């Protein structure tokens, strides 16, 4: 099956990044338009994002869970472990994960998301993109 390509926007409430690693939680939503794979036409997909982190202004260290809800009511639960150095001036970050449950379970995920800023709590908004590569069928 061909990959599913999604583009859209992300709105995440963040505790903000500090100079030293700080435990925190975050949550928000993403809105995508997805196509490819087994989708017959471009499809609007909503997701809920939540996670925990121990990040700083120089390093993202987090576990993100994103649950996509497809128009037919099925869901895909995605887990993305993040361990990434923050480059000065970066506006987004590319991460990889796995569909752990639901539609496309076992598939790989590559996601590009807005980079949180160093500073006080804030809403992190910006473009988001995701590619889901479905797992090969078991023979």
Where are the language model's segments positioned?
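Amphipathic hydrophobic-ligand
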Residues: 2-11
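A broad structural signal for short, well-ordered beta-strand segments within beta-sheet-rich domains
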Residues: 6, 23, 63, 123-127
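Predominantly extracellular/secreted and cell-surface proteins with exposed
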Residues: 10-97
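Extracellularly exposed regions in secreted/surface proteins, prominently low-complexity, repeat-rich
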Residues: 92, 96-139
């Amino acid at each position: 099956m061909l990959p599913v390509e999604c583009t859209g926007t992300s709105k995440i409430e963040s505790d903000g990044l500090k100079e030293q690693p700080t435990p925190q939680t975050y949550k928000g939503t993403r809105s995508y338009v997805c196509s490819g794979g087994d989708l017959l036409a471009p499809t609007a997909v909503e997701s809920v994002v939540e996670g925990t982190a121990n990040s700083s202004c120089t390093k993202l260290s987090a576990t993100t869970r994103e649950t996509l809800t497809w128009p037919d009511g099925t869901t895909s639960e995605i887990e993305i472990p993040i361990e990434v150095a923050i480059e000065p001036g970066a506006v987004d970050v590319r991460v990889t994960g796995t569909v752990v449950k639901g539609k496309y379970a076992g598939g790989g995920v590559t996601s590009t998301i807005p980079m949180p800023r160093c500073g006080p709590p804030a809403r992190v908004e910006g473009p988001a993109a995701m590619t889901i590569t479905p797992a090969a069928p078991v023979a």
